Amino acid sequence: MRIDRLTSKLQLAISDAQSLAVGMDHPAIEPVHLLQALLEQQGGSIKPLLMQVGFDINGLRQGLVKELDQLPKIQNPTGDVNMSQDLARLLNQADRLAQQKGDQFISSELVLLAAMDENSKLGKLLLSQGVSKKALENAINNLRGGAAVNDANAEESRQALDKYTVDLTKRAEEGKLDPVIGRDDEIRRTVQVLQRRTKNNPVLIGEPGVGKTAIAEGLAQRIINGEVPDGLKGKRLLALDMGALIAGAKYRGEFEERLKSLLNELSKQEGQIILFIDELHTMVGAGKGEGAMDAGNMLKPALARGELHCVGATTLNEYRQFIEKDAALERRFQKVLVEEPSEEDTIAILRGLKERYEVHHKVAITDGAIIAAAKLSHRYITDRQLPDKAIDLIDEAASRIRMEIDSKPEVLDRLDRRLIQLKVESQALKKEEDEAAKKRLEKLTEEIERLEREYSDLEEIWASEKAEVQGSAQIQQKIEQSRQELEAARRKGDLNRMAELQYGVIPDLERSLQMVDQHGKTDNQLLRNKVTEEEIAEVVSKWTGIPVAKMLEGEREKLLKMEELLHQRVIGQSEAVTAVANAVRRSRAGLSDPNRPSGSFLFLGPTGVGKTELCKALAEFLFDTEEAMVRIDMSEFMEKHSVARLIGAPPGYVGYEEGGYLTEAVRRKPYSVVLLDEVEKAHPDVFNVLLQVLEDGRLTDSHGRTVDFRNTVIVMTSNLGSAQIQELVGDREAQRAAVMDAVGAHFRPEFINRIDEVVVFEPLGREQIAGITEIQLGRLRSRLLERELSLSLSPEALDKLIAVGYDPVYGARPLKRAIQRWIENPLAQLILAGKFLPGTAITAKVEGDEIVFG
């Protein structure tokens, strides 16, 4: 008989049977080998068919193993085996059955049917399972659905619905779907479209994360609960698994064949199945090769005739990009817009999901945490949508608490490491003989004993707290299971079981949970098992870098003493320091306008008075490093076209993909100090871009993404009016008026009006220069310390430096040059000459007109 008359699945099974025969040293391939191969075949139709008819698969496997063990074995096999006469006879019988059914190819199930007809050991084994041949034949007819086997791959296209879809209604019945809260209007609109006679295909369109897939799951739950019109009752909602449909389609036409078989099975169900296609845009162009038809075009006729009941889901951008281009496909769908829920709706959704997350993570989630998740995610995570981002916050915060429960608490871990360290040290000291070592060993032994007692006490507390937490989690899990059982009993109409669960089991479990909670009311020492607002705020801070967590005592003190800390770097300029400190305090106390930057300042004053230095000091205060500042030198933006560098080049221009210099920096660090240095040197068009930032705290880049500036402190520095400041030294009011005139002449009124505060820096006096000298020398000393050298200056040398470095016109910069010339240059020569070796204390004093070192 010709092998090419067998379906590809049967050919593979014969190949596996041959391998089995060779492996067991059998002389030929017997029908038993073939049935064993068919039974174990990946993705084969024989095992599901046998289970459907009522075969005991394990019993059949054992019988086959027994038969295989009884077959004769050969010594020194060559590895070459052929079909036995019994197997050839079986395949001929299957061939006759195929001809009777009008098949062009012999399929696996006909071999099984022929085996039951045989009066052989295999036939007896199959019939001993208590299943009649007639029952098997009926099951085969149902499997084939009246279709003939006219293709070698026909077996693979069978059971297409089981292979390429996921039954959402079944998952809803098993309680595996999360509850869907709200979204009634969207679900009602979806049902309304599904009830139409033709083009009854809704497509859910909305931003990523607004809950499009959840609406489909909500529809599945309503179908199961019978909360739908009669036209949808009893229907099944299947989600198409696009990955399974495409995966492994190696040859041309194989993908189309799979899709066609899926559509055929759907049409046979006569409208009893609704197909849910998530990421609908993937259907457009899927499987398209040279001369091939894509999935979207194959769906069109079925959609138009109403044979395919379909619910799609895709995002606005992808709908526009893929589906709107294909007008013929678009008109077959009816749009259902899914808007982002409000904060209140999100809170309701989170309350509905709370129990699922509590059971999964085995922790309690407080209502405060739910409200905080909705509010904080809405305010601080601007590039994602509710409710997805709020759910993620709850999930991650709960996961964090669970991780702490499962692993050793930090206190115990620290003690453990300390004990190991001390024990290693004591072992080393035991080898020493001198008195000092013995005394040290005694002290160490006492310390080890004390720490071991502390460790064992804490370990006991940890064990009891852990047991308490786990007990509560187990009861919660039982409550969740009982509620799922109650739903199943309600659907079946089992009133006895419903009464038992509703009035007996669930109230008892809830009472037990209350008792456990009452017992554990005292605050745990080591373990937290509740997700509160604080945990949510910590996760938001980790995601965005914005400090929204509750301030610790140390941070409050630091903020209250902010001016003092800034003055350690910035000498004088009290007005500017106070203005900046107030802006930061407003932001951290949560009192700043949520729709504007935390603070926007224009620093004016002559060169070298500390405008840029104050920004660096602020960045260091907030982030412990002055590198955390987004610094933009506005002198680089003197041309009109350079505006594009701030927000990104327009589409079609070089550099479009790179994004904007300012927008990208703030997207990466939404909580930062933005310094626009020498702002008056920029082209006037740059200020038009800044208007939006200063007023609304937002800026749209060239990609259409909105960048959030609400958590930034924006500082612009300028030298405008510095000549007037020098002329009017001592008269603050006249100085300010003159400077504001200069600013008004250069900037437009709408720009000046949007700045929170215009700060005029005073020229530096001799006293301030003395303070700055100490700071500059302190930096030099820290550099010398790396070489193990120290430096001290006599009062005369210090006065000399101040006298040389003081220039009211140029501020503190001449001082830096003076230190370089009088201190750093001669010191460098002396160090290189080898005069000062590591460990030397260098002193500088004045001799004549020079500063000398000794």
From Swiss-Prot:
Renumbered residue ranges of the record's region Repeat 2: 83-146
Region named Linker: 341-545
Ranges for region Repeat 1: 6-71
Binding site for ATP 1: 206-213
Domain notes: The Clp repeat (R) domain probably functions as a substrate-discriminating domain, recruiting aggregated proteins to the ClpB hexamer and/or stabilizing bound proteins. The NBD2 domain is responsible for oligomerization, whereas the NBD1 domain stabilizes the hexamer probably in an ATP-dependent manner. The movement of the coiled-coil domain is essential for ClpB ability to rescue proteins from an aggregated state, probably by pulling apart large aggregated proteins, which are bound between the coiled-coils motifs of adjacent ClpB subunits in the functional hexamer.
Similarity comment: Belongs to the ClpA/ClpB family.
Descriptive protein name: Chaperone protein ClpB
Organism: Pseudomonas putida (strain ATCC 47054 / DSM 6125 / CFBP 8728 / NCIMB 11950 / KT2440)
